[in-house]
Amino acid sequence: SDKDHRFDVQTSDGITVSAYGTEFNVQAYAEEPDIKATLAEGHIQIDQINQSASQELIPGEQAVYSRHTQQMQVRKANLLVETAWKDGKLVFRRTPMEEIAKQLSRHFNVNIQLQGKEIFDYTYSATFTTETLAEILSLLEKTAPIRCEIIEPQQQNDLAFTRKKVIIRKR
């Protein structure tokens, strides 16, 4: 978009993000409890359905709308982490294993299952650019006592294939 012509992104929850000459990111995954809008440069305005007030962001800010409470909060954003995907990167900064699993699942179109409550306590800081899923999992295994098992897609009776699956458990 440019400064004179706005570009709107609407989510199914009635959130509209209007951009004016800007670089921004909106995350509105159905399975996630929050909707996030992050501004890298330019100007965005966020409107909620049935709300008269709108929220404006300045570069470096992120608005987080809770689907549960239907409240919005603005906080400082880590732009490296929030916008890395557009350059094909996966960037994690003290990121919990559960969030890493979600991002790897989306990025590589696989089903990742975490087994064992201690797995959820692990956090990682890493940047991945050209690594394959197998390479990333191998690196994760080297830095924590975990084991990653990759289960390749299987053909079912209806000739469809299952999704590739990864099971991560404690060693």
Predicted regions and their residues:
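Short, small/hydrophobic-biased targeting/export segments
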Residues: 1-70
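N-terminal export/assembly leaders
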Residues: 70-171
